[in-house]
UniProtKB/Swiss-Prot annotation:
Cellular component aspect of the GO annotation: cytosol
Gene Ontology biological-process entries: mismatch repair
Gene: mutS
Family assignment from sequence similarity: Belongs to the DNA mismatch repair MutS family.
Gene3D superfamilies in the cross-refs: 1.10.1420.10, DNA repair protein MutS, domain I, MutS, connector domain, P-loop containing nucleotide triphosphate hydrolases
Protein's job: This protein is involved in the repair of mismatches in DNA. It is possible that it carries out the mismatch recognition step. This protein has a weak ATPase activity.
Keyword Nucleus carried by entry: no
PROSITE patterns: DNA_MISMATCH_REPAIR_2
InterPro entries xref list: DNA_mismatch_repair_MutS (IPR005748), DNA_mismatch_repair_MutS-lik_N (IPR007695), DNA_mismatch_repair_MutS/MSH (IPR017261), DNA_mismatch_repair_MutS_C (IPR000432), DNA_mismatch_repair_MutS_clamp (IPR007861), DNA_mismatch_repair_MutS_core (IPR007696), DNA_mismatch_repair_MutS_N (IPR016151), DNA_mismatch_repair_MutS_sf (IPR036187)
Protein name as catalogued: DNA mismatch repair protein MutS
Entry superkingdom: Bacteria
SUPFAM superfamilies hit by this protein: DNA repair protein MutS, domain I, DNA repair protein MutS, domain II, DNA repair protein MutS, domain III, P-loop containing nucleoside triphosphate hydrolases
UniProt: ATP binding residues: G602, P603, N604, M605, S606, G607, K608, S609
Amino acid sequence: MADSKISPGMQQYLDIKAQYPDAFLLFRMGDFYELFYDDAVKAAQLLEIGLTSRNKNAENPIPMAGVPHHSAQQYIDILIELGYKVAIAEQMEDPKKAVGVVKREVVQVITPGTVVDSAKPNSSNNFLIAIDFDGSHYGLSYMDLVTGEFFATTLSDFMSVCGEILNLKAKEVVIGFEITAEQEEQLQKQFRLLLSYEQEIYTDDTLINPNLSQVEKNVAGKLLQYVHQTQMRELSHLQELIHYDIKDYLQMSYATKSSLDLIENARTKKKHGSLYWLLDETKTAMGMRLLKTWIDRPLISKQAISERQNIVETFLESFIERSDLADSLKGVYDIERLSSRVSFGKVNPKDLLQLGHTLSQVPYIKAVLEAINSPHLSKVIATIDPIPELESLIHSAIDPDAPATISEGSIIKTGFDQRLDHYRKVMKEGTGWIADIEMKERQASGINNLKIDYNKKDGYYFHVTNSNLSLVPDHFFRKATLKNSERYGTAELAKIEGQMLEAREESAQLEYDIFMRIREKVETYIDRLQTLAKAIATVDVLQGLAYVAEKNHYVRPEFASQKVITIQNGRHAVVEKVMGVQEYIPNTIQFNQNTSIQLITGPNMSGKSTYMRQLALTVIMAQMGSYVAADYAKLPIFDAIFTRIGAADDLISGQSTFMVEMMEANQAIQRASHDSLIIFDELGRGTATYDGMALAQSIIEHIHNRIGAITLFATHYHELTSLSEELGHLKNVHVAILERDGEVTFLHKIAEGPADKSYGIHVAKIAGLPGSLLSRADNILKQLESHSKDFIIKDNSQQSEENEPLNLLTEETSSQDIINRLKEVDVMNMTPMEAMTVLFDLKKKIK
């Protein structure tokens, strides 16, 4: 109900705000977007802008803050980045012509998942996700409102849903079902997502194939409904929904991708030091986005991989053409982003000029590809359409010096429209006519300083100072009186002014109408532009991969039909790039059909983790269609990679390192297949020694006996190396060490067999620990290695109660049980692992 104390304008604000309670409402008032009440208070703090009040002298002044409309986007970006929604209420009529309160409406709601017009555009996708549940399966759909891409899949459980949300790096998820409080908390707090809710289904058979599963049609329809509700317009650039299955790609969890530094360095959160950084030699924004997608989702189809490899090889063999191609690609703007701006009605003259320039480059790109004359390029060449009629329209219509905004005029080229040319001629000649009138009246009147000026209020007028008022001719009529001068008009000047003002108004309106027609025409080409964008992006990524392969001396990997790996002198591609080729020590990796697990021992800092990551990156590069860092590589095609490396542990969620270890290990145990790759680095280090060792052995046995996946398992539990006697497909390898005159050198080379020492004290020495501490540690180590029975080794230099040997038999209640258990033990026929298990059980009895 309206409040009698509130003005009609503020009541209008409150009515609109009530429709968008979860968003900041930017309320257009003249040249500013204003915020009121709680929105103003909160925005002033978040945006660091001034907080004032409306009706300051009233009993309850209204908090108010505002931002200029021309710079509003930067403030909107800040709010969106912080996870808020922003509703934009525009003036829907000219305030000068309005009767009563100016009509205002919300024209768009901008959310973290629907950003298309950021002041800081980047080359990454921004996916908006929707999820739904039909009682047995989850539907997940996502789209990028910039590129128009639209996908849907079916998932079996909520864990898979969470995994896909993390992989897509979404900021906003639309919920289409009755979500549980636990699920909501996980998405909202643990993953820090903005959750929106939508139950209605938008039906569009042109975008959503009726033959899709019902849960996918429902979730895609709810996503479309949310998009239409927030964007409030038909979006012509949205592409037909594509069904996908996560099993169609090499599956990797978000933790795996993070620990392998695929898109960004896990430690620095920067591009530098990632696989993306290494491989990114793209020249276009579309290519950069596609490269990220390829790294994120390597293929499992040998044919599809080979098609990419064939083009990379073709480019490698065509150095001159590839160089010309790269130069041409540098002149290509972001076609996908430009197409979305057309669809959203936000395209400006500069955007069209960029599109026109891009289209002018396409014939050169196509000609270079055709000159290579390779059958491997025929498919992509067929999709490269220069769209000459659109390029011609833009270049014939848009002035190359056109401003960025439509309202400034001077957009349309002279010669494009006869009426517009006529109005411009009138305005141009009118300026000359006014100059002639000025000269004529100056001579006739004898007023030597007589001149004609212009302002919006009085139009054109003669400026006459008070000292010359006696010379003013009779046909002059007064328009305005100032302190030291008068302003006059004449019938002749008024006539010319009328013609010029009419020409100016008609010209401005006509130019606007012409631009709108051109924009509508461009919109009809969006499908062809998107096809062109995909083709150029593909060519861009592949030429970049060829450049990287040539520069770094990579080889084309072969794919084996059997589970065998031969990587000769393989390198960790990213580490090699950072260190330099001369510094990096390559390693050969081999798995035959009789080996599925390599148990890797050796000291920290010796290169175990790099060796394991090297294999994972080689697999990813190979299956995305890239060449790999090796002298020779032959691999099977893997269906998934599971890792537990630990570089990207996130303890903020409240989970311990050990819990994270076990969760990631469990994911591999539950989901890995015979065709997967498993990489475990120091599994079990997050708990007590015997706990960790027991779990490590059990997991190794499970992988060996039940899964059969190729596995690299690095461990500091040297006792586990004895498992090779029991597990026929397990092979011990270690990092070679050169020990001479008490000094240790890490060779960073993998050798067969288990490590004989851990060299932990040497690593501590490198880290700079005090000499006295190292000497004490060395003394303890020697006593342990001599099988001392004491649990704590005495320090002869410092006697204290704390150095006394630990007596396990301090309680009579437990001593007899322990004695009985020891009597049962057959020491001579026990393995080291069984002996440790017994000791572990005994230790638990005395706790």
